[in-house]
């Protein structure tokens, strides 16, 4: 892969920050940020993507594969997609503040 296509891939790895009550508690207690990432993303890719996009130093990455829920509409059953969540630990002194839009 060329350097350009690698950088394009890294920009597509992070889908969205996961801002929930649980993610906020984890961020306050363990200094970890939760992100929704592509299902085929690896830990090194997630680390490189966070460092590239947010200009911070990453200490570690923990990944959780979340199974999609079974939902029902009348008689028919459907299923939501499986997705992947990444908890990213930042090195001391580093911070990402989503409320400020940084």
UniProtKB/Swiss-Prot annotation:
It comes from the Bacteria. Keywords: Ribonucleoprotein, Ribosomal protein, RNA-binding, rRNA-binding. InterPro entries: Nucleotide-bd_a/b_plait_sf, Ribosomal_uL23-like, Ribosomal_uL23/eL15/eS24_sf. The keyword Ribonucleoprotein applies. GO terms for molecular function: rRNA binding; structural constituent of ribosome. Gene3D superfamilies: 3.30.70.330. Pfam families: Ribosomal_L23 (PF00276). The keyword ATP-binding does not apply. One of its GO terms (biological process) is translation. GO terms for cellular component: ribonucleoprotein complex; ribosome. One of the early assembly proteins it binds 23S rRNA. One of the proteins that surrounds the polypeptide exit tunnel on the outside of the ribosome. Forms the main docking site for trigger factor binding to the ribosome. Belongs to the universal ribosomal protein uL23 family. Part of the 50S ribosomal subunit. Contacts protein L29, and trigger factor when it is bound to the ribosome. This is Large ribosomal subunit protein uL23. The lineage of its organism: Bacteria, Pseudomonadati, Pseudomonadota, Betaproteobacteria, Nitrosomonadales. The gene is rplW.
């Amino acid at each position: 892969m060329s350097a350009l296509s690698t950088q394009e891939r890294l920009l597509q790895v992070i889908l969205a920050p996961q801002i929930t009550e649980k993610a906020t508690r984890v961020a306050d207690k363990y200094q970890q940020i939760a992100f929704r990432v592509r299902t085929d993303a690896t830990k090194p890719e997630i680390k490189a993507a966070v460092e590239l996009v947010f200009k911070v130093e990453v200490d570690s990455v923990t990944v959780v594969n979340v199974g999609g829920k079974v939902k029902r509409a009348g008689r028919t059953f459907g299923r939501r997609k499986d997705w992947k969540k990444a908890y990213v630990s930042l090195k001391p002194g580093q911070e990402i503040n989503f409320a400020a839009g940084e």
